[in-house]
Amino acid sequence: MAKIRVYELAKELNISSKELITLLEEEFSVEVKNHMSAIEDEDADLIKELLSGKEKSEKTKEEDDEIETTAKNPIKESINNKKSNKRDDKNEKVNTENAEDMAIITMTSDTITVKEISDKLEKSYAEVIKELMLMGVMASVNQEINFEMAEKLAAKFDTEILKEEQDEEDDLEDILKDSEEEENLQKRSPIITVMGHVDHGKTSLLDAIRKSKVTSTEAGGITQHIGAYTVELNGESITFLDTPGHAAFTAMRARGAQVTDIVILVVAADDGIMPQTKEAISHCKAAEVPLIVAINKIDRPGANIDKVKQELTEYGLVAEDWGGDTVCVPVSAHTKEGIDELLEMILLSSEILELKANPNRKAKGTVVEAKLDKGRGPVATLLVQNGTLTVGDSIVVGSTYGRIRAMFNDKGENIQSAGPSTPVGILGLSEVPEAGDKFYQVKDEKTARGIADKRKEKIRDEYLQSTHKVSLEDLYNQIREGKVKELGLIVKADVQGSVEALKQSLEKLSTEEVKVRVIHGGVGAINETDVTLATASNGIILGFNVRPDNNAIIASERDGVDIKTYRVIYDAIEDIKSAMLGMLEPEFKEVVIGTAEVRQVYKISSVGTIAGAYVQTGKLARNAGARVIRDGIVIFESELASLKRFKDDAKEVAQGYECGLSIEKFNDIKEGDIIECFIMEEIKKKTL
């Protein structure tokens, strides 16, 4: 149903927007926020009819009053009416001309450039700049002016400027609505995530499917970041997401499960279910994603397919040939056996799911990976989930934005557009987005920038509130918990996905005694700014597949900042564990070093009670802990206040010797008491 803006209706009715808003609220009970609000055409027509009827009624009343007055003094009234009519006609003519001449333009943001307002006013740049100079403002063509200044400037050219209270998120609301008409939906390719335990052949299986070798280029044979690939089978395409196989990458796997349609769980036939396999099963169940089990390495001598199926039943996954509904396909990435059957099962499962999308709408999807390329700037791998993305489109990606300058597929070929379920690399973003961010296509780059700026502002406000909002209760707790230590880390990596995964896995190492906090995470080389931040926060810098630049090295040596660089993630986690072990509060155990029997007691007024004792086992040491045991019951615990051998002070007295001793703050020593001497030894920690 068509709508009309309040200011447009006010113009038609020849009244001000303010008067119309008041009228709508008071007489018609129609709530409007401002002059840019829209009302239904039906309501507008009703208002026009009622107002025209009201005007006629008022006009009739005025005419009746006029006739009555004229009848009282016809000659005088006739003269006055002639003068009045002439004056009214003149004013009405001027007002009508002004109303007709007064154009209306709108601006959507708080500021507008001189160029933009010149185009809207349909005036030359020189004319507009001249008027601004007369108003005392020196501005160039590309300089921005605020709304108040724009309003005054527009008035000089007999134009009214209105500020459109536009909510940039409105554009996204239409995209987010998934109420697609059935006739617009078309079949789309399935999106597959491959999960599995480290070294179970997950990447090798993908290599076998894609008929390419990637594993050899990865450190330690482990995939270091997410990639997206498309393969063709019998004229149909399948999109694969490859997630790292280590347990530390829980966040990455979970992110993959959010965009995937089917999960392939790779389990080695000679190894069975392992910790990362259990995690992958949990993710699939939590995300309610269908699962296909690929039992890999069936060519190995120790392969036992039935054992794997048996272990799967413990997690509620019963194979189809065992009477369950879990698809299990024996495969070998080495010999390529079972690969075709696996792909066929994927296509069969996708047919059952009836995967559909509308390619004829604005695109939306998810960021699979993002990095900063020296030559090309921010490069992002996007997975289009709905609509069609085209070169030249403007998109919002989390708190960043851009206009797509170039687009390429997983083979590195330049393409012009990408439909649903297609992974593409793009150039043209203003910044490197976060892996897992959602992207949406909007009408133009200005709208995209507006949405991104608002999101950044919101994130900044939330950060400031959470960082600087300190209450007395918080301060008290920090003082009270003075023993709590914190290990601050700055994480830099080659790709955003690795940063996110490292952050989450490192923060999980936190214990009650040591808190691990990632102060900053970013993409690119370690620079001087990172060192400055580490100095201020007393933190350590971790680099993953990146190196520090020269300025960073000089600054770190000067400030004593520790920079650690790694190529394999296990090493990073192990080093942090070791660092944490040194920060943990030491644990102690009690070690009894000796016992002595009290044989005689001496009462000395100025000193207290002195016990003459015989060392039965071990030794007694001065300042060690001491317990007084009577009839097998500990009656007092303190420490040795003094220890003497004859008249000389002794550091320790060994077994078989007599000595004199006193107990700190205890004088009720009796003959026959046993003095047990002990020390507290620190336990060296081996694991967290």
UniProtKB/Swiss-Prot annotation:
Residues 72-82 have a biased composition (Low complexity). Keywords: Cytoplasm, GTP-binding, Initiation factor, Nucleotide-binding, Protein biosynthesis. This is Translation initiation factor IF-2. GO terms for molecular function: GTP binding; GTPase activity; translation initiation factor activity. NCBIfam families: IF-2 (TIGR00487), small_GTP (TIGR00231). The keyword Ion transport does not apply. Residues 242-245 are annotated as: G3. The gene is infB. It is found in: Cytoplasm. It holds the Pfam family GTP_EFTU. It comes from the Bacteria. One of the essential components for the initiation of protein synthesis. Protects formylmethionyl-tRNA from spontaneous hydrolysis and promotes its binding to the 30S ribosomal subunits. Also involved in the hydrolysis of GTP during the formation of the 70S ribosomal complex. It comes from Clostridium botulinum (strain Langeland / NCTC 10281 / Type F). InterPro entries: EF-G-like_DII (IPR053905), IF2_II (IPR044145), IF2_N (IPR006847), P-loop_NTPase (IPR027417), Small_GTP-bd (IPR005225), T_Tr_GTP-bd_dom (IPR000795), TF_IF2_bacterial-like (IPR000178), TIF_IF2 (IPR015760).
